[in-house]
Amino acid sequence: MFQDNPLLAQLKQQLHSQTPRAEGVVKATEKGFGFLEVDAQKSYFIPPPQMKKVMHGDRIIAVIHSEKDRESAEPEELVEPFLTRFVGKVQGKNDRLSIVPDHPLLKDAIPCRAARGVDHQFKEGDWAVAEMRRHPLKGDRSFYAELTQFITFGDDHFVPWWVTLARHNLEREAPNGVATEMLDEGLVRQDLTALNFVTIDSASTEDMDDALYAEALPDGKLQLTVAIADPTAWIAEGSKLDNVAKIRAFTNYLPGFNIPMLPRELSDDLCSLRAFEVRPALACRMTIAADGTIEDDIEFFAATIESKAKLVYDEVSDWLENSGNWQPENDAIAEQIRLLAQICQRRGEWRHNHALVFKDRPDYRFILGEKGEVLDIVAEPRRIANRIVEEAMIAANICAARVLRDKIGFGIYNVHMGFDPANADALAALLKTHGLHVDAQEVLTLEGFCKLRRELDAQPSGFLDSRIRRFQSFAEISTQPGPHFGLGLEAYATWTSPIRKYGDMINHRLLKAAIKGETASRPQDETTVQMTERRRLNRMAERDVGDWLYARFLKDKAGTDTRFAAEIIDISRGGMRVRLVDNGAVAFIPAPFLHAVRDELVCSQENGTVQIKGETVYKVTDVIDVTIAEVRMETRSIIARPVA
């Protein structure tokens, strides 16, 4: 009687359209229930039985039910699943496999089986890549996944590296391939093998891509020649090796080892500017005035060089600071170091006065044993030798930016536009509350940005600087010349690391076209998109491996009285994030550890402060003493507690 009844169908349709619905993202909790977060202000409770249909992070549409003034969400439609491809740990029970995703908020095992063509016999503890195949909101009875790749066994000491690389879908090994002979590029190479070029790197560096030679001119000016390794002399554009480098975009530097962009035969040997080996190079000669200005007589040319010394940062720094036992091999090398230090001094002063200089932050180096165990983590401050190389490279990149802009019209540029114009008024208002008066329009210009940065650098603490960071735009890779506000420069194009950056290889080819007086074709936008994406993935991989190693390193300090100095780097509603000064580890301090009475505590991300009973007790950039309360290995998170 009711079958195909149009009135009944209409009533159903009406009920459906009148039932309130909301779209949002599922947030799971450790208690079994969850929330549908619609926006920053509004969320709906999802009861435990309904949570079985969804996963943390799923974007869904849900029906909203109201009972006794309480609203709850019933998941109805999947908009976008949180999990598609993921990594996890396999569990095996009675020949039935399941996989637990490697994610802090995903605890449930998902039934799975190996995909066709994967011949590994999976067992308990194995790490694998999986892809979701079924979801309850797609009409399936349950969640289900397929194992598409075996990563490694559970007892492999190098799990942090292999799992992280698989998670971000990055290569594990150096590319294959070899270059047998140099290309005929129609370039005349200047023979500079007699000059005393030197390289300055870490003791363990094999891929040396820059060598320096300095000369004092009679008029008190200094001449600097920067010679850069020349992989494009071996790798033809569009060749198999070139395409591999284009995809990888960068050498991936992880704690303990790197995965090069080019085959090791090239990166660590044929192209590496090894001491006493004759190598092709692309070179730039510039004149530096007494005040550090780079004069207009910039010259780029192809060359052949022979490095006369592989110098090490710490040894050179010690020698310049009159400490340690190391001595340069001969007077010629000593003279080079002295002249390079003078150039560094001049360029540093010029950048301080006319551009911007980054604050020195130490690099943290993991010292690992043969089984990947963390023996120590050392802070390596940026010393004079590091600054010598940095100033030479920045000067060379400024030269390339000018030459490419004037002779070619494009290149691979690092562009940073400073503050987002949409944030200018809010920025000016915030600065005003702290006694700094800026014009909202002026601060959007390079000059205005530099002026503000110098004022911020003169502040007694970095607190205000940390507050305005959220108003800044991101640096971009662009084919169009543009300013780099972060460096305080009108244009910046890197070409000094072609062994490890594909963008620098592109700039080499464009600079060679300029040397020969030829025209060149503009790099495609897809190339800059790929480079930006790879840079993001490599940084995430470095962070993920680091988090894992920090957790391993600090595990035995959990629950002890060992104190660590820690800088507050972020404050949120739930607590504070701090960075341990001695080793760089990031830890979280939950709000209850700051003050027991929740109503008396205000943690404000907006203001970067923690207030207790209305009084500011902590703020971002403060350095406090903490102990390690807990290390959770499964999520690689470190929980700290302030020392009372």
Curated annotation (Swiss-Prot):
It holds the Pfam family OB_RNB. One of its GO terms (cellular component) is cytosol. GO terms for biological process: mRNA catabolic process. It is found in: Cytoplasm. It comes from the Bacteria. The keyword Kinase does not apply. Its EC number is 3.1.13.1. PROSITE patterns: RIBONUCLEASE_II. One of its GO terms (molecular function) is RNA binding. Residues 561-643 form the S1 motif domain. Residues 189-516 form the RNB domain. HAMAP family: RNase_II. Belongs to the RNR ribonuclease family. RNase II subfamily. This is Exoribonuclease 2.
